[in-house]
Amino acid sequence: MTTERAVWEDIEGIVLDAVGTLIEPSPSVARVYAETAERQGITIDEGEVKRRFHRYFRVDEVDEQLGPLATDEASEFRRWRRIVGNVLPELPDPERAFAELWDHFGRPSAWRAFDDVGPAIRAFRDAGLAFVIASNFDGRLRAVVRGLPDLAECEDRLVISSEVGFRKPHPTFYQTACEGMGLRPDRVLCVGDDPENDVRGPERAGCRGLLLDRDARRPAEIAMLPDLDALIRAFRDHRALRHA
């Protein structure tokens, strides 16, 4: 675990990523896609689905980062239709599959909050920290957050790329998150599971970034923590040192 004291200095607000940081699909993406294919009479191994999804999601992400990063609801809809089509090209009715998957991942029942999310949200509030949940997602995230008990009171704290008009790592995305908390970027810490979107991108926009590496697979040179419990402990330790 690598942290820097400078990461915490003068922090007044936190920008939290959503998927992979606060929530994850449950059942897994691979299982849901495989079951969708099965309903059309096509059997695909979950491991193969997982490999395809990671490949095409990453390809799409890289293509987006090379472009202007502009987005809206229609763009996100087209993006996910493209990804689903690439992951499940064998299906006789791809539009039906896409519609099923789009609806599925827009329901709270398709997601779970990590066990450390509820305590972390309460700790942020108790500490008087401003915070927002900021994600490359679309309007479906509002229903998802509203339906998860640990996050239900956070719907008014959402910053969603399709509503901002730009995806991470565009500077406007982080600026919008900071403005929503009424804070300067240098008073804001961004926390998430993607080195580019949650660390390097925020730093270019004047914020600070901290990687949440739940699977311990990320670059060691980036300041990171393994979970939200560690995030809260580190923040409390820093405050205790500052007031000692």
Task: Describe every region a protein language model picked out.
Residues 4-118, 122:
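N-terminal helical cap/lid subdomain that shapes the substrate entry/recognition surface
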Residues 1-14, 24, 47, 92-98, ...:
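Asp-based, Mg2+/Mn2+-dependent phosphohydrolase catalytic module
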